[in-house]
Structure formats: C-alpha cells, structure tokens
Design a protein with these regions (language model features):
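Conserved FAD-binding catalytic core of PHBH/FMO-like flavoproteins
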Residues: 2-154
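Conserved mid-domain beta->alpha element of the FAD-binding
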Residues: 45-46, 102, 134-135, 155-225
Length: 225
C-alpha cells in the first residue's frame, strides 16, 4: 500500500503524528495533533480503527464493548511448519470455543498464526504479550498438530477483541468515518477489512460524482453503507 501511494504526487504520508481532535468551517476541515501541528483539507476521513479519535467528534458513545473473544497472534518461519500444512491458503482448525487460523505472509516465508478462545477474564488489552501456558490450557485435548504448532511459539501477542453497537450516523459536515472507526466488528473471515474496502470504493464513487458538494457526497456514502 505504501508503494502504491508513493506513485501519486498528491498523496503524502506523514508518520509519528497522533490526532487529538478535528475542527471544521463551511469550506474546510482540519485535524489537530498531539504536538499542536494541524492539517487542513476539504474533507477528513477517519479510518483510525476501533479506538478512533475522529469518531469522538461525531458519535457520542461509550468505549468499545468487550466481546469475550481473545486472540493470540504470532508468526512462525515456514521451515518450522509441518510439510502437510505448508499450503498457500487460509487453514482453519476449529474446536469447542477455540480455533486456530494459519496463512502465509511475506511471499510465503513465514506463517501467520491466530489462536482464538472465549474468556471474560480480560477487560481490555491490545498488542500486549500473552501467556503460552494459558493458550496451552485453552487448547488442551485438541488435535496433535494444533498443539505441536502452538508449542513452537515462545512469544505471543494478545488482543482482547471488541466491537460497538451499530450507529445510524457517522458523518458530520466535512468529516466522516470509514472501516472499524464507523462500524467495528469481530475479525472473523476478515469481514472488517472487507467492509473497509467496500467503504473506500463507495466513498470514492460519491466524492467523484459530487466533487462540488462534499457534504452531500459524505451523506450519500453513509446512506449507501
């Protein structure tokens, strides 16, 4: 994606900026960052995920809702994956209230592993280290291949999966939301990523059709989605 963006002179990627809030007038909108820098534009699209800062200026709701689903994530060099499972496909190993998903990354050099189980033990957590012992306990009694694969990982990152209640409005003037910032959902079947891509196509369509009426374009986009 970064390489694709770099092919266009009108796309500028700015790193190490945290957006705190937004402002808008009749003719423009702006984001204000933690370091007090600001950026102006005709339109602002908040595609900043479940914990969206942009959303706070549009939707007056509470913190994300803890789902009771916990995901442990890790990667494994392909040469450590058993031959029978070195497939260039998504493979799902399903068990009672648990499942393991594996698929290749980086041109097939590594295997991504996502182990999911149900637990109400955690209230929040994102990109923190999980305990291998807990994963072993949750997956106890499952297929030997699954247990062997899990045992090969020494360090797991843990995510407490969350979502939100649906809302009818996620646009305000020249500011709108996209993807999980607008309508977060659990990660199953990559549905959140798919919805974000659909959002982007729909948004581009309406902005192209109503380039002189940004507010109308954002409302049409929201109504379609």
């Amino acid at each position: 994606l970064k390489r694709a963006c770099e092919q266009f002179s009108n796309i500028k990627i700015i790193f190490n900026k945290r957006v705190l809030t937004t402002r808008q007038t009749e003719t423009s909108a702006s984001v204000i960052c933690e370091d007090q820098s600001s950026y102006n534009a005709e339109v602002i699209i908040g595609a900043d995920g479940l914990w969206s800062e942009i959303r706070k200026n549009i939707v007056n709701d509470e913190a994300p809702r803890v789902s009771g689903h916990i995901a442990y994530r890790a990667v494994l060099p392909l040469n450590e994956v058993p031959d029978k499972a070195r497939e260039n496909e998504v493979i799902l190993w399903a068990g009672p209230r648990t499942h393991l998903v594996q698929y290749p990354l980086h041109r097939g050099e590594i295997m991504n592993l996502v182990a999911v189980f149900h637990s109400h033990r955690y209230e929040e957590g994102w990109d923190v280290y999980g305990e291998s012992s807990e994963l072993k306990e949750r997956f106890s009694g499952q297929h030997a291949y699954v247990l062997d694969l899990l045992a090969k990982i020494n360090s797991w990152k843990m995510w407490v999966l969350c979502d939100r209640e649906p809302v009818k409005n996620w646009s305000n003037g020249r500011i709108s939301l996209l993807g999980d910032a607008a309508h977060p959902m659990l990660q199953y079947l990559a549905q959140g990523g798919c919805m974000a891509i659909e959002d982007a196509v729909c948004l581009a369509y309406h902005l192209d059709r109503q380039s002189e009426n940004i507010i109308g374009a954002l409302q049409a986009y929201q109504n379609n989605r």
